[in-house]
């Protein structure tokens, strides 16, 4: 697997930190008790996501093992680790994530809620609570010198509570590394998304267009606020490796799926 290495400079760090970053693994699995129909669905989706010749589960295992062998401080899992919500898939996801001791920083994507009705329901959150620090909508992990923040934007319907909690994290003043699934619209990302997904690709694959909810547009404005202590934003969803500025000096990094044979590694060093 190819590694893209990025060095991030942050003020006030007393040591070097290393994080890996992947997303969109699309694990699908059926437990025997779920029956033949569930098994057929899992097999079909696994085959669909193996278009590179690499099984999603094998690629995810390799990504986790690389982070483990490197002694990384963690691995960012920016959504769609699960292809859809089912008992079998959740069992496979848990077994996968528990296979190494490296801390996992996981946020929901659109596929983690696949099949949930109504579309804006948060009723699926309990299935992921133990994997997302008890709070899939918003979690924060404090490293002392900086903090990691994960938010669910997988349905493009940001909630008032999420933005309030993000504002509280801003007020703490520490540099933040922000994990989401759907990248926000920037000048840098529009053309790569159009090239991969067509002229209308940004409508589906990016957050921040005029037809998105006011809360979602407000969220994007918060990420572009020059006063916000955001050091960098990390995302997935577009199945494309990308790095581009949100505003000068603030990068948005998007991972390609592990099954496409690329993983990103970040080295955080003192400025």
Tell me what each language-model feature is.
Residues 31-32, 117-118, 189-191:
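Short, solvent-exposed loop/turn and secondary-structure capping segments
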Residues 55, 60-74, 147, 156-246:
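His/acidic metal-ligating clusters that form di-metal
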Residues 24, 79-80, 109-110, 181, ...:
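Active-site glycine-centered loops adjacent to acidic/histidine catalytic or metal-binding residues
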Residues 47-53, 81-83, 152-156, 205-210:
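The substrate-binding groove and active-site-proximal loops of carbohydrate-active enzymes
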Residues 2-11, 86-175, 199-205, 219-222, ...:
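Extended active-site neighborhood of metal-dependent phosphoesterases/phosphodiesterases
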Residues 26-29, 112-114, 184-186:
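Feature marks short, surface-exposed loop/turn motifs that line or immediately flank catalytic pockets
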